[in-house]
Amino acid sequence: PENLGGFGKDFVTGMLATEKLGGAYSFAVSISAHTGIGTLPILYYGNEVQKQKYIPKLASGEWKASYCLTEPGSGSDANSGKTKAVLSDDGKHYHITGQKMWITNAGFADVFTVFAKIGDDENLTAFIVEKDFGDITINPEEKKMGIKGSSTCQVFFNNTKVPVENLLGERQGGFKIALNILNIGRIKLAGAAIGSCKRVIDHSINYANERLQFGRSISKYGAIKHKLAEQAIKVYASNAAVYRCSQNVDDAIAALVAGGMNKEKATLEGIRQFAAEAAILKVHGSEVLDYVVDEGVQIYGGMGYSAEAPMERAYRDARINRIFEGTNEINRMLIVDSLLKKAMKGELDLMGPAQEVAKELMSIPDFSAGSDDPFEQAHTQIKQFKKAVLMIAGSAAQKLMMQLSKEQEIVMNISDMIIELYVAESVLLRVEKLMKSENSSKISEQTDILNVYLYDAADQLNKYGKDALNSFADGDELKMMLMGLKRFTKQKPFNVKEARRRIASHLIAEGKYCY
């Protein structure tokens, strides 16, 4: 907020800034941890006195922030932390004792958001702890695979004396704070990954244009064009999904503020409403980044393995993103869990549409030619993809019921289908919007991106769907649903090679990512 030293801009603007900083390697990690998980707990959960004391100095950079949640025995199971907070006899202070690890910015942070359990409490409580409070030991910097320019240390709180007024939010409300801040961190990570991807693609294109083999630039060869096109297609898709969700969040915040909620609470609630999407974006964005840097190394060939070339650092730095903000496996579980919880609360009708799809399986397929309009065809394909997801998710939920959460392989199959569906639809919506607002001749390659993405998504959905169905169905039921899956993921013939070549040729001519 402007009254606390910020710019007061909307969520989309914040995401654009996050994307721009995303290509800054280790610095991106440091500043994201400071402005995100380090500062936001105080902004969103602090009382007015806490916000006035800390936020202006954090916003200006005078103070740097860190976030102390992870412990040696509590990673994904964050609420199992052992750090303790004991109230002093005079009731004026808490004495915090415990060990935190993998703490970003720990080496230079002035302020820590620390999670601990008071007495025998079941859930965590958050505290604002200043480095100057003393009795804090910062271990030497960790020797990491990547992001070597960022600070990552273990932090020990040795009976650290913290004023009671530095309790953040409510007692035992720390786990809720952690979850909500992680939702923000996930979508921000996806935005930063886009920035990293675009920088790597620029390097890939420039090297491919400059590197001569057999008397020609390697960018003229089909194998390299395929790699460049795939890098761009995946990043375009991630970009479409990230900014679709970001605008949805802004719209939700605006509606909540209009209804009388204050901006901080509205922001948290707006993002909470899209917790499943945040997990989708985090998984997809981090895995796209891994793909892009891997192909970047390959385009560079032997030089890509050299620490003197830009790909080596990009390759190492990218890997942490599949672990940050909850591992991708945990996030895949969260996607399905979030949707099932919404269904049980009546916020999402999952079983109704799933039952309609089940009825459709018994009917005769529609063999009509359909519309000639490419966007209408794409919308029809997305509708079919949705039927595939509903069929499998609905059947799995109905058949396995409470056991579904224990069948993690099936949950991950369903989650991967949901991710593919959400991202594919996002690409369609983005290209369609551009088609309506710009000269259609200017976005022909973006239409190619849409068509290639849908082509590949159909195969991916079919693969994930078959894996799931073969894991929980059998007999005639299995045969019927496999036929339905084939129907719902049917793909018309399409020359993907030429489409990728057109996409790559545009990238090569521009000398940079240009979509």
Language-model-detected regions and their locations in the chain:
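Charged, glycine-rich active-site and insertion segments that engage polyanionic ligands
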Residues: G270-M303, T447-K466
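Internal helix-loop-helix
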Residues: E2-Q52, P56-E62, I103-V111, V235, ...
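Secondary-structure edge/capping motif, primarily at the C-terminal ends of alpha-helices
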Residues: Y207-G215, C245-G259, I299, A396-Q403, ...
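Glycine-rich beta->alpha junctions and the first turn(s) of the following alpha-helix
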Residues: T137-A240, D250, F274, A279, ...
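A short core secondary-structure module
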Residues: K92-I138
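A short, Trp-centered hydrophobic/proline-enriched beta-strand micro-motif
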Residues: G61-L69
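Glycine-rich phosphate/cofactor-binding loops in nucleotide/flavin-utilizing enzymes
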Residues: L16, I37, V292, M303-F375, ...
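C-terminal amphipathic alpha-helical interaction region
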Residues: L361-Y515
